[in-house]
Amino acid sequence: MLLLKEENIVNGRIEYHRRKTGKLYSVKIEPEAQGIIDRYKGRQYLLNVLDEYSNYKDFISRINKALKNIGPFERKGLGGKKVRQPLFPDLSTYWARHSWATLAAELDIPKETISAGLGHEIGSDVTSIYIKFDQKKVDDANRRVIDYVFGKEKAGK
């Protein structure tokens, strides 16, 4: 995702082939995502992450370290040194996927749609050859999860 370029935006969607599998992914750009793209526009890539960090591993390492520091701190000792008490010591970038799937399940979004939204294959390899999953279901699921996070939708609908 960090290597996306402007040409990966096609008709209001981010389209790219995953390196690991070669599979084409197409994700609708919701207004909230467009706001992030606009705010963090990069020089060479869609986002400025690689303008700021030397490589993907450096970026992930720094982000995960920062996520682990979320939480209150207090000053201790004569020098007033900050002592952190992380709220979520195991928090990492992987939690975004886990959280999306959990929230989607709370909204009674079908497991098949959640699986597709995570980029997992549907059913057996043979079956998935004959089934073209309706991407609109994933688009709708993404919108519902975003609305739920912002308090615009209630669980159990």
Residue ranges and their predicted role:
Residues 65-116, 120:
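Short, basic (Lys/Arg/His-rich) helix/loop patches that form interaction surfaces
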Residues 44, 50-54, 81, 137-157:
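C-terminal secondary-structure termini that scaffold catalytic or DNA-interacting sites
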Residues 18-22, 118-144:
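Catalytic-site neighborhood detector that most strongly recognizes the C-terminal catalytic loop/helix
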Residues 19-69:
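C-terminal catalytic core of Y-nucleophile DNA break-rejoin enzymes
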Residues 7-13, 90, 109-131, 152-157:
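Short, polar N-cap/turn motifs at the start of nucleic acid-interacting alpha helices
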Residues 15-24, 49-59, 87-95, 132-136:
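Short, contiguous acidic/charged loop-to-helix segments that flank catalytic cores in large enzymes
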